[in-house]
């Protein structure tokens, strides 16, 4: 990506203040935000991210997820993100795929995919996810 695209991505991610800083001076969370900005700067039609919210506090987790949702909704970017935080996934993405042993065992709207039974079967924990999921 060229400098203008990187600058625009830093602004979009909300980390203009980090421009020009040495990566060794950044916290893990700041480094993660820079990586997200660099991915966004590519302006690719498909964005593949592995744990884009790792090392981030709640405010920045939400900001990154809102950015990804905005990229999908307004820029037409397809976002494929690996997330282990089921609450974030079900709140921000209208379609989820649940993998078990590397295979897709469920695919669809969060409310249909992340049932208590499926979470128990796949993740081995008995929890009920509450709140209205994205996309029903």
Where are these regions (language model features)?
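ABC ATPase "signature
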Residues: 107-108
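Conserved ABC ATPase signature
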Residues: 22-26, 30
